[in-house]
Amino acid sequence: SAASDVYKRQILYRLFEHQYLGRDEARTILQNIAEGKYNDSQIASLITVYLMRNISVEELAGFREALLEMRVPVDLSEFKPIDIVGTGGDGKNTFNISTASCFVVAGAGYNVVKHGNYGATSVSGASNVMEQHGVKFTADIDRLRRSMESCHIAYLHAPLFNPALKAVAPIRKSLGVRSFFNMLGPLVNPCLLYTSPSPRDKR
């Protein structure tokens, strides 16, 4: 609608002027993106804003809330799983360290539910690695449980579990730069986790 277009332009102008969004505004924007209310150019503009300035805690929290509210929930809590995550896009052209770590931990008998995506800024996103190893992405809870029981690991391909991440994936890939979605990824595993250490944890 015309009113909606005006609102979206107003939001972008505010961001271009280095103003910050409130938590509820951030949540609404990501919900609208998932519902297809923003076109590719508008999404690219939004991503670019956060390359020009730091994202605020309130904005990040709002985006995270939207992703968690829209997620396809996965209950594997009986396994008390962990996820080992990184933000990706370090520009070092290294192998995918966090995904390799998941194999090691699962091989040692600990239960891992890895949540990841194709690389937007590299060739070795978690989904790229898993696909190369013959993993078939699924949202079927019975198949995920069988994977946990037999291998101590299940893989959640992000676009299958969140419409917003699916909507922005081609734009992120086209831009080829780190964005706030790199920060959000480790925070929005759709499975209820026992714990989620990251490579930067002092532990």
Segments predicted by a language model, with ranges:
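General beta-strand structural signal in soluble alpha/beta enzymes
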Residues: 83-84, 112-116, 137-140, 155-157, ...
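A glycine-rich phosphate/pyrophosphate-binding beta-strand-loop-alpha-helix module
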Residues: 47, 95-151
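Single conserved hydrophobic/aromatic residue that forms the stacking wall/gate
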Residues: 1-7, 194-203
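Acidic, glycine-rich active-site loops and adjacent beta-strand->loop/helix elements
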Residues: 86-91, 116-122, 161
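Acidic, glycine/proline-rich low-complexity segments that act as flexible tails and inter-domain linkers
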Residues: 4, 8-93, 108
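Phosphate/diphosphate-binding glycine-rich loops and adjacent basic-rich segments that engage nucleotide
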Residues: 143-196
